[in-house]
Curated annotation (Swiss-Prot):
The keyword Transmembrane helix applies. Keywords: Cell membrane, Membrane, Transmembrane, Transmembrane helix, Transport. It is found in: Cell membrane. Its main location: membrane. It comes from the Bacteria. The keyword Membrane applies. It comes from Bacillus subtilis (strain 168). The chain crosses the membrane at residues 20-40, 283-303, 344-364, 372-392. Belongs to the ABC-4 integral membrane protein family. It is a multi-pass membrane protein. GO terms for cellular component: plasma membrane. Coiled coil: none annotated. The lineage of its organism: Bacteria, Bacillati, Bacillota, Bacilli, Bacillales. InterPro entries: ABC3_permease_C, MacB_PCD, Macrolide_Exporter_MacB. This is Uncharacterized ABC transporter permease YvrN.
Length: 409
């Protein structure tokens, strides 16, 4: 076995250019499969996280119509009409062992923010200390909102780099004044960090985002009911359970009349996971089919070059048979060479696939996840290509008659 592998490597490296060109189809096919699987797994995880709260084991509890009234033309429900959340309910949720954090915050996507003649239309968050405990940010200029800011009506704001670029083309934003819905705010910090509401297809803070203390929210929007309730579980296994528990406690604080109109609920994560998985399977089948064509072409190339190799080594085969080598020895030697050739192509394809996936994450900022089963499967598949397409040349070599082979010039 080891001798067959040694001879295979010797043959491959004695014809380097020919071997590389032969492996090219296999390399491209395997690289495409690895890149596709890595990107799909990364996008799948990011999509699921974006739908439940964008990571950190957090899930959003939403206030929405009961029994589908909104869709059927019933009364519309707005966050402005949501009843205040009792402090006892907040304490009850936080006291549950499954809950690591809880934040009642505000989110608006319709605000117009001005500085002189420049305008931005960011996502505006009204937050407290609990929010930053759950979703840390990284300050690049200035400072964060302090505890004193967050517990007061200080009209201060943190903006991300997208807002800074839109409102302050010269890049100088600190201590400048901006106006939001007619209310002035002073910029105290600029941040850059991945946002929990960010689109999976966009880069870090491709969307404009800013933070204000939640106590100033009534000045901006005219109401004082949280639009978002985020629950952070102690582990990923408890995300759904913690969210349902929080929704139940919040609903217990509503009257029967309020429950008839609207209620708190959470997304079904299992349903989300199934939908994402279904989409990924369909997409993977489509792209996998395209990659398989490359592997098929690569396999045909392997068969062709092995037939050429058999022809070139006809006298060598004749000598070995004349010295007593059996058919299965000759067959196994050429089959081993084909498998070694495609296995090297498979390994290079895996490395190239990870390289392509990593490059795509730079061009289109999104994660990729290394899939060990995909790597193992790709290597096994590349070996299978060698066996399937190397079998015919190997059989041809093993059937050569010693006398005819020795006569070959």
């Amino acid at each position: 076995m080891l001798e067959h592998i040694r001879i295979s490597f010797q043959s491959i490296f004695s014809h380097k250019l020919r071997s590389i060109l032969t492996m090219l189809g296999v390399i491209i096919g395997i690289a495409a499969i690895i890149a596709i699987v890595s990107m799909l797994k990364g996008q799948s995880e990011q999509l699921k996280q974006s739908m439940i709260g964008m990571g950190n084991n957090a899930i959003n509890v939403v206030y929405q119509p009961s029994g589908g009234e909104e869709e059927s033309g019933g009364p519309q429900v707005s966050y402005a009409s949501a009843p205040p959340v009792a402090e006892e309910t907040v304490k009850a949720i936080k006291s549950d062992p499954m809950v690591k954090g809880l934040s009642l915050y505000y989110l608006s996507e319709g605000a117009s923010v001005f500085h002189l003649t420049n305008v931005s239309y960011p996502q505006v968050y009204g937050v407290d200390d609990d929010y930053f405990d759950m979703f840390p940010i990284r300050i690049t200029e200035g400072r964060k909102l302090t505890e004193n800011d967050l517990n007061s009506t200080h009209q201060v704001v943190m903006i991300n780099e997208a807002v800074r670029d839109e409102l302050f083309p010269d890049g100088e934003a600190l201590h400048k004044s901006i106006e939001m819905n007619g209310v002035p705010f002073k910029v105290v910090g600029v941040f850059k960090e991945k946002n929990q509401q960010e689109s999976m297809f966009e880069g870090d803070y491709a969307n404009p985002v800013l933070y204000v203390p939640k106590k100033v929210w009534p000045l901006i929007e005219g109401f004082d009911a949280p639009t978002q309730i985020a629950v952070q579980a102690d582990s990923s296994e408890h995300i759904q359970e913690a969210g349902v528990m929080a929704a139940d406690l919040l609903n217990q604080g509503l009257s029967e009349a309020e429950l008839e109109k609207a209620e708190y609920s959470v997304m079904d994560l299992q349903e989300i996971a199934q939908e994402v998985e279904s989409f990924n399977q369909s997409f993977a089948l489509l792209l996998g089919g395209i990659a398989s064509i490359s592997l098929l072409v690569g396999g045909i190339g392997v068969m062709n070059i092995m037939l050429v190799s058999v022809t070139e080594r006809t006298r060598e085969i004749g000598i070995k048979k004349a010295l007593g080598a059996k058919r299965r020895v000759i067959l196994f030697q050429f089959l081993t060479e084909a498998v070694v050739l495609t296995s090297i192509g498979g390994i290079l394809g895996v490395l190239a696939g990870f390289g392509i996936a990593k490059l795509l994450t730079v061009i289109f900022p999104m994660p990729f996840i290394v899939s060990i089963p995909a790597v193992v499967g790709a290597l096994i598949f590349s070996m299978a290509v060698g066996i399937i397409f190397g079998l015919l040349p190997s059989i041809k070599a093993s059937k050569l008659q010693p006398v005819d082979a020795l006569r070959y010039e």
